[in-house]
Amino acid sequence: MGSVPVPVANVPRIDVSPLFGDDKEKKLEVARAIDAASRDTGFFYAVNHGVDLPWLSRETNKFHMSITDEEKWQLAIRAYNKEHESQIRAGYYLPIPGKKAVESFCYLNPSFSPDHPRIKEPTPMHEVNVWPDEAKHPGFRAFAEKYYWDVFGLSSAVLRGYALALGRDEDFFTRHSRRDTTLSSVVLIRYPYLDPYPEPAIKTADDGTKLSFEWHEDVSLITVLYQSDVQNLQVKTPQGWQDIQADDTGFLINCGSYMAHITDDYYPAPIHRVKWVNEERQSLPFFVNLGWEDTIQPWDPATAKDGAKDAAKDKPAISYGEYLQGGLRGLINKNGQT
């Protein structure tokens, strides 16, 4: 008997271009679509977003295919290279031959220069980015920093849509998501094709599905993901696991667990997982994070009436820095070092 086909999740394509404009009614129409998606499977594709995705994929592929093992070691985060004491988040996440196939390069806010107040203090979760040699990778840093601000701009527009969807002012989220303080990160993940593929790099779920990364909720306010046109993601629904169709023309967007916390799970963080697929592909998430001290008081949108924004009585306010530290630590403890 053949395997039972997995249902396809409802993941709508939403035209987000009105969120860059001034037409309030069109913005509210987008907000209603975001609201419906957020309370269904929790995912939607943002289209007409204004970001050059072929350029993003092409430049990322050029970097992934040209960086050497020695360069990866020189850029490695502390979890892999103990000499790099200050690199907790930013840097290269190494593959381990025979054990771990996925590899990635993470970079943070380009505003975090050596004279930034949070770097000088220093404050956890803030790091100065490390970059490969410009002579060996000409233009890579310029590309990466430009992409950061391109996707930051898109994310700001989408956050305006989320704010309207929740009955808030448009700047409800963006006032906490500022260029000089945001802890948002870009991760350029490579899933390679390998022959043979190392068995220890393949995990098996309780239902027998082979996985590259086990179930989890994202540690973010929202996540804005570009991925290759290779189906790999699954979302957990009341009807069971469902496939999220791949679409390399849009950004796949979902709420993270901070959004779930502050909305009292009105917008939950969808539980999802990454299937094992032995095919060369990219997964390039932008984890949208607020600033270190930014704190949003939780409330229950479902019970707010007549403009009232009642606090969720059993949900304490958590600063974003505290949330991010604990969330990333918990994810590593659960699923291992990426």
Curated annotation (Swiss-Prot):
Its cofactor is Fe(2+). Pathway: Antibiotic biosynthesis; penicillin G biosynthesis; penicillin G from L-alpha-aminoadipate and L-cysteine and L-valine: step 2/3. Keywords: Antibiotic biosynthesis, Cytoplasm, Iron, Metal-binding, Oxidoreductase. It catalyses: N-[(5S)-5-amino-5-carboxypentanoyl]-L-cysteinyl-D-valine + O2 = isopenicillin N + 2 H2O. Changing residue 227 to L: Does not affect the catalytic activity. Changing residue 49 to L: Strongly reduces the catalytic activity. Binds 1 Fe(2+) ion per subunit. 2-oxoglutarate binds at residue 281. Its main location: cytoplasm. It is found in: Cytoplasm, Cytosol. Changing residue 216 to L: Impairs the catalytic activity. Gene3D superfamilies: B-lactam Antibiotic, Isopenicillin N Synthase, Chain (2.60.120.330). N-[(5S)-5-amino-5-carboxypentanoyl]-L-cysteinyl-D-valine binds at residues 89, 93, 185, 191, 216, 218, 283. Isopenicillin N binds at residues 89, 93, 185, 191, 283. Its EC number is 1.21.3.1. The record marks 213 as: Transition state stabilizer. The record marks 283 as: Involved in ACV-binding. Signal peptide: none annotated. One of its GO terms (molecular function) is isopenicillin-N synthase activity. Changing residue 137 to L: Reduces the catalytic activity. Fe(2+) binds at residues 216, 218, 272. One of its GO terms (cellular component) is cytosol. GO terms for biological process: penicillin biosynthetic process. Isopenicillin N synthase; part of the gene cluster that mediates the biosynthesis of penicillin, the world's most important antibiotic. IpnA catalyzes the cyclization of the tripeptide N-[(5S)-5-amino-5-carboxypentanoyl]-L-cysteinyl-D-valine (LLD-ACV or ACV) to form isopenicillin N (IPN) that contains the beta-lactam nucleus. The penicillin biosynthesis occurs via 3 enzymatic steps, the first corresponding to the production of the tripeptide N-[(5S)-5-amino-5-carboxypentanoyl]-L-cysteinyl-D-valine (LLD-ACV or ACV) by the NRPS pcbAB. Belongs to the iron/ascorbate-dependent oxidoreductase family. This is Isopenicillin N synthase. It comes from Hapsidospora chrysogena.
